[in-house]
Amino acid sequence: GTINFMHLNSFYICSSITECNCFMGKLYVVPTPVGNLEDMTFRAIRVLKEADLILAEDTRTSGILLKHFEIKNAMQSHHKFNEHKTVEGIVNRIKAGETVALISDAGTPGISDPGFLIVRECVKSGIEVQCLPGATAFVPALVASGLPDERFCFEGFLPQKKGRVTRLTSLQEEKRTMIFYESPYRLVKTLTQFAEFFGAERPVSVCREISKIHEESVRGTLTEVIAHFTQNEPRGEIVIVLGGKED
């Protein structure tokens, strides 16, 4: 495209930052809906439409979202298996003036999703990083749980094997509300383990399919909620909100 210059006191000020590479670009971290597409913000759509490059965890999954909102910008795969190899090239593109937007399959990148590495490298390089407010699964689950939400700790996915018992042991004295992500296939096993470590009467809320048609929160003691999901096979994305240790 053409570059417009404005003459001002013998200085030329470029009005097209990206095209002439006068300044460094920017990294936008853009949340995407965890369920209902209506949860996409106007600003998120605008940023994605204006980006020179969109980094997507899975280009096929994100392709559906982008097509829905008529976003046709260049997209590149960026996930935990390739981010160590691609991050340097992306940082260099931003340094050269490109605007890059990072999205994950659902929710806010970096929260139990790829994103930390590219953000850290951009910060190290002096690149401006802006994270848009938006969808993330654990906040609605926490607020709707009925458990104390003024202080909480987010644990994400527990280690599957090595370090799992150590992590659970370290949380036995935790007084804040705890938040975990889990797959439906491991839910009952994890809740049963919680009962062993935290006591069967500990209050819990299991929220699944957040912002989708079959959204559901099941609340009660660990014993009660284990019984429910033993009889009713859990499906969909799961957030476990567990009460902290009482004084």
Predicted regions and their residues:
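Glycine-rich, flexible N-terminal cofactor/catalytic loop recognition
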Residues: 23-80
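Cysteine-centered motifs
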Residues: 14, 20-22
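A contiguous loop/helix-start segment that scaffolds small-molecule binding in enzyme catalytic cores
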Residues: 177, 181-247
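Short hydrophobic targeting helices and cationic amphipathic motifs
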Residues: 5-8
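Glycine/small-residue-rich loop that forms an oxyanion/phosphate-binding "nest" at active or ligand-binding sites
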Residues: 87-136
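Conserved helicase motor
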Residues: 78-83, 158-159
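Class I SAM-dependent methyltransferase SAM-binding "motif I" and its flanking Rossmann-like core
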Residues: 117-174
